[in-house]
Amino acid sequence: QSAGMQSILWDIDRIGQLTREIMETVAKQNKGKHKYSKEALKELKKAMEQIQMIYGSCIRAISGDVDMDIKELMRQKEDIMQLDEKMRKNHIARVGKGKCDSKLTIPFNDVLHNIDRIGNSCVNLVEVAKENVTMQAFFAED
């Protein structure tokens, strides 16, 4: 139980760190000389909304929702990976058309990588929950 609880806490903390990195990267780029295009921001918003849904599902799982379907979560994670690939291609196309600055390619890819890593941590959380390790252990009575 304690190793599972430690894993839950580590992944939740990691998700928080990655989310902060995403927010800082996007904010920094939008305050600087080079800004993301409206299309790029729209795609990033969509990716964050998808990861938010996955995160909500994994929180329900570690809160004791035994009906959480790990296969469905993996499908959602796969959807994010496909969106990631599409967003990278779209960014390169926008750079080619002059809609996005090539100097934003590395920060944009960093954001996408962090979104993928959040998805990985969400999958980890559900896998731990499937082993009957949940946050309910914090509230166990003596």
Please report, for each region that a protein language model flagged, where it lies by residue.
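Cytosolic, long alpha-helical scaffolding segments
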Residues: Q1-D142
